[in-house]
Amino acid sequence: MQRETISVPVGAQEIIFETGKIARQAGGAVVVRCGETVVFTTACAAPNADSTTDFLPLRVDYQEKFSSAGKTLGGFIKREGRPTEKEVLVSRLIDRPIRPMFEEGYYNEVQLLSFVWSYDGINSPEPLAICGASAALVISDIPLIKPVGAVRIGFIDAQFIVNPTIEQQKQSKLDLLIAGTEEAVLMIEGFCDFLTEDQVLEAIEIGHRSIKTICQTLEQWRAKVGKPKNRETLRQLPKELYADVESIANPLLEKALRICEKQKREEALAEVTKAVNDRLMPENEEPKYPAKHIAYVIKDVSSKMMRQMILNENVRSDGRTSTDIRFIDIEQSLLPRAHGSSLFTRGETQALAVCTLGGASMAQRFEDLEGEGNNRFYLQYSFPPYSVGEVGRVGAPGRREIGHGKLAERALMAVIPTKEQFPYTIRLESNITESNGSSSMATVCGGCLALMDAGVAIKRPVAGIAMGLILENERFIILSDILGIEDALGDMDFKVTGDQNGITAFQMDIKVEGITIEIMRVALKQAKEGRVHILNKMLAVCPTYKGEMSRYAPRIETIQIKPSKIAVVIGPGGKQIRAIIEQTGVQIDIDDTGLVNIAAIDLVSIEKAKAIIHGLTAEIEIGRIYSGKAISIAPFGVFVEILPGKEGLCHISEFDVNRINSLDEFVKQGDMLMVKVLDINERGQIKLSRKATLQSQ
């Protein structure tokens, strides 16, 4: 295959797609360039589907090579290994818009691999990775319905920018990543500084215009270099199977789907499955259909019935209408030793949020293509198996937990005070103790309440809500505060956080071929009504953050020293700062500007440490009188420490108003002396006089 390229203008840059030169044995392999950022993506599929599989086994892995930025990984191991948090998040960003675009019935295992090979520090690799994955699938034999494009949108000086540079992103009030087809939007993920619903919609519209151009270009490329699609393995379930399942299941589903309580409803649905299996897979007989096919059709039939129930009657499984919010219960300060805690319960979804405060050393360190850094606010989301009454693995967080935690973290980031306003490192934990939908939004609500309980001076409280969608041809209905079953069987999961004045985060995933701007407009309007209702419930329990922090939380005081004095405080090999910590029991953090944070449980320890640091960094003043300690005595004079680490010489002639021949009769090592600074020579040597202090009395 010869080398083929195609380009498309996007924003202020041009994106170039190339194939035919590298990885020619892969099903599809594409190099995507923008500026000097280069992302390489491959798409490969198994030749056949597993007969027991009733879903698309899609695996997406994104990796940032440190060599792409001319760097080597820190630490002993120099090879990229376990994916970083960012790599997991970008892998999810690629997966979410691509997954719904495979043709129905395609269950072959598919793997998408995306690597950042070159990074210029100007152009973001994330949208390029999504476009590259789409392009690799488009030119392969894997049956993708239509091309997918993606762009990032920023908002600077009241202007929307398509694919802003890295520097522009730092100034932007919006970070929106949007993906879709030529006709509709498939996925959005955005974080902003209280933008309005209209501003968010405008950003989505601007982004989709660029996506259309990308998709049109990729469709032209498919026609030119694409392989014929392999549809031989598409699984078409027989109509007779649907008819058999519906005849058995429909009468039972009518009742089961109207049971309000989750566990009882699931038990009833399990009975429906058993009834179908007993009829279609009788014991000691050859089953009429494979078990996996029957399970798939039962789920499909259940979805159709639930959807018709909502569309025709505006009644949901738990009895609510489309706009109703579940009952909310809030309890504050339930953990006596925690710095801040909140138990947020919404229906059968419950989150226990815990806030912990600490010094700068508690910050979360990271290393990426931009370099090393620290996060002074971070949120960790945990979804244990007991929250849904199951037995499962407990250990390192999975991709879903990382994604949900980052969404909630970014939603709350907009209200976290600056380091100057609140010098603490803030760690939030969200422990999901019950789950029936919207656990990430319960994390936002519970996390906000835990911050206020800990006394964090947040800018303003925020709440979150998850919206659903039932779409049938031209008919649609938006669901507020969705249940787990509505997420599983519905068409959309649209999460929105903020307050009555604006939005801080939003995330949308869909299972159909895209939705229109008009549907999103209705969803955002309904989401605002819902989150304001939830926020009012939160404010009724906790109107504002506590004026005082927990007595178990550390106290932090900040002092400023000259940058030139940092080395003095740290000492050779850190000897001096370790001595201060051991002597006072405090935690000390110093940044490059000379800002010193001193943290301890009690203020007495902080004051001791401050006094030592002030002494170390104080400037010796000529003419000033100091109280110092005699460090050593020589025949010609006594050396006196007037400040920590600062010694001067009081010559024997300057010791007393009367002439003396020996100092041994007048001073011993360790005695405290009042001395005056007479001079400091060019080598920094300090000349002291005790006689001058006696003469001034």
Curated annotation (Swiss-Prot):
Record function comment: Involved in mRNA degradation. Catalyzes the phosphorolysis of single-stranded polyribonucleotides processively in the 3'- to 5'-direction.
GO cellular component terms given for this protein: cytosol
KH domain mapped to chain residues: 554-613
Catalysed reactions, semicolon-separated: RNA(n+1) + phosphate = RNA(n) + a ribonucleoside 5'-diphosphate
GO biological process: mRNA catabolic process; RNA processing
InterPro entries: ExoRNase_PH_dom1, ExoRNase_PH_dom2, ExoRNase_PH_dom2_sf, KH_dom, KH_dom_type_1, KH_dom_type_1_sf, NA-bd_OB-fold, PNPase
Predominant location category: cytoplasm
Keyword tags: Cytoplasm, Magnesium, Metal-binding, Nucleotidyltransferase, RNA-binding, Transferase
Protein's UniProt name: Polyribonucleotide nucleotidyltransferase
Family, similarity comment: Belongs to the polyribonucleotide nucleotidyltransferase family.
Residues involved in Mg(2+) binding: 487, 493
Cofactor needs: Mg(2+)
Enzyme class name: transferase
Keyword Cytoplasm: yes
CDD domains given in the database record: KH-I_PNPase, RNase_PH_PNPase_1, RNase_PH_PNPase_2, S1_PNPase
Ranges where the S1 motif domain occurs: 623-691
EC numbers: 2.7.7.8
Subcellular location(s) per record: Cytoplasm
PROSITE patterns: KH_TYPE_1, S1
